């Protein structure tokens, strides 16, 4: 990592952007292991996610969110190296990687916080690869947009401190965007 820029900061949380050389072999490793727009439960209704997803871990049985358990697939050597590298760079104990694939600008994820039961919320790190999309931050108290951050390839977004309790984040619909985007999100899972 060569540089870091702070884009959001409060007394108890922050969002930093870091430079990183991402190994594209990780894309090859996960490409065929992602579930295409799997089901989740939102407000008691079954619906499909608007992106493809996969969860990779050698320690966690899976990632439970929105009423469903996504079972973990084993880490490949490339993913294991990437996970170890993130833990060294951020002095964390991440043990799982959630991979999202956005096919184009109609794929999205709504405003949310990574604060589900079973994950430690003080550090969440995400690496982007592919087409630039908007990573939108909103204040939880009034839902106002705090920042629109371009997800440039190889950039790390590091949400730390109480960020998940103070803010939401999302990848909004951007109909004009045609390209593919992957995100690799690192967390510590206790299940």
Residue ranges and their predicted role:
Residues 1-191:
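Non-heme Fe(II) oxygenase metal-center motifs and adjacent flexible, charged/small-residue loops
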């Amino acid at each position: 990592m060569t540089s870091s820029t702070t884009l959001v900061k409060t007394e108890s949380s922050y969002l930093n952007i870091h430079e990183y050389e991402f190994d594209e072999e990780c894309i090859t490793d996960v490409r065929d292991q992602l579930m295409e727009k799997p089901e989740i439960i939102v407000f008691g209704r079954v619906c499909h996610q608007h992106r493809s997803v996969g969860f990779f871990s050698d320690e966690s049985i899976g990632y439970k969110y929105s009423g469903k358990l996504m079972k973990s697939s084993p880490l490949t050597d490339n993913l294991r190296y990437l996970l170890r590298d993130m833990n060294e760079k951020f002095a964390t104990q991440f043990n799982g990687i959630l991979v999202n694939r956005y096919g184009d600008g109609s794929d999205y994820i709504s405003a949310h916080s990574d604060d589900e039961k079973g994950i430690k919320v003080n550090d969440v790190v995400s690496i982007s690869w592919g087409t630039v999309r908007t990573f939108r931050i909103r204040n939880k108290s009034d839902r106002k947009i705090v920042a629109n951050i371009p997800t440039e390839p190889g950039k790390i977004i590091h949400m730390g401190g109480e960020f998940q309790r103070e803010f939401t984040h999302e990848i909004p619909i951007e109909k004009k965007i045609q390209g593919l985007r992957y995100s690799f999100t690192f967390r510590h899972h206790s299940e």
